[in-house]
């Protein structure tokens, strides 16, 4: 039976302009946000790569041989690519925002199970509001059914070589997340349904 290795890239860059300080170094229950996020993944993966500035690297005090650091990029996309290059294992990779510390262990486990079967998955929360699609004039042109609309979150998980290829082919282009790059190249991607609790810390109110 094949034993696949699971790599995880946890992004730890970003300007935190809207937060007012480096949000990853804010504390939740006496732990920084980035450390809280890292500890959620440690039991389930084989390595964790953290693209980050020296400032953030110095503040991560968790001692574990699974954790490795690499240089953060000017953009999230560059940081993820640096993380991919630093991976030791080349089977499957999860990519997660360091500012999403409320990820549930059950969601991590389901993401790993599904990426092994399906090859590319994205964690997302079903829309609770009615969504309107508009044209460039602001005119509403359609209203999709809510059950078909999801807010994309992380982790997003892929076959390592496929997401590496996507980053290399689309280097320098502005994509909002990794799954968008895979979609652009024609890959099929599947949803792992999660809750809205898996929010990204953007403002101070998000810590409540």
Model-derived regions, located:
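N-terminal glycine-rich phosphate-binding loop and ensuing alpha1 helix
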Residues: 2-55
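Conserved alpha/beta core of the MobA/IspD/sugar-nucleotide pyrophosphorylase nucleotidyltransferase superfamily
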Residues: 2-4, 149-208
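Residues at the starts of beta-strands that form the adenosine-phosphate
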Residues: 5, 46-48, 92, 119-120, ...
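Short beta-strand segments
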Residues: 9-13, 51, 96, 123-126, ...
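Residue-level signal for inorganic ion chemistry
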Residues: 10, 34, 83, 96-97, ...
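Conserved N-terminal catalytic core of the sugar/cofactor nucleotidyltransferase
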Residues: 33-90, 170-171
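Conserved beta-loop-beta/alpha segment of the NTase-like Rossmann-fold superfamily
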Residues: 68-69, 75-136, 153
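Short, flexible, basic/aromatic active-site loop/helix in glycosyltransferases
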Residues: 132-156
């Amino acid at each position: 039976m094949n034993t696949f290795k699971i790599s995880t890239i946890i992004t730890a860059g970003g300007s935190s302009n809207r937060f007012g300080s480096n949000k990853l170094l804010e504390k939740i229950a006496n732990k920084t946000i980035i450390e809280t996020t890292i500890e959620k993944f440690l039991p389930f993966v084989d390595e964790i790569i953290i693209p980050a500035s020296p400032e953030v690297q110095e503040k991560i005090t968790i001692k574990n041989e699974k954790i490795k650091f690499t240089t953060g990029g000017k953009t999230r996309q560059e940081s993820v690519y640096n993380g991919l290059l630093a991976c030791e294992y080349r089977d499957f990779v999860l990519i997660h925002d360091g500012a999403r510390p409320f990820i549930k262990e059950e969601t991590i486990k389901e993401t790993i199970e599904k990426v092994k079967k399906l090859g590319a998955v994205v964690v997302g929360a079903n829309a609770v509001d009615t969504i309107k699609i508009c044209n460039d004039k602001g005119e509403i042109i359609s209203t999709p059914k809510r059950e078909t609309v999801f807010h994309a979150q992380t982790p997003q998980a892929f076959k390592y070589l496929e997401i590496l290829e996507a980053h290399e082919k689309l280097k320098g282009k502005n994509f909002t997340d990794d799954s968008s790059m895979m979609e652009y190249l024609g890959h099929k991607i599947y949803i792992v349904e999660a809750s809205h609790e898996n929010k990204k810390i953007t403002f101070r109110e998000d810590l409540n």
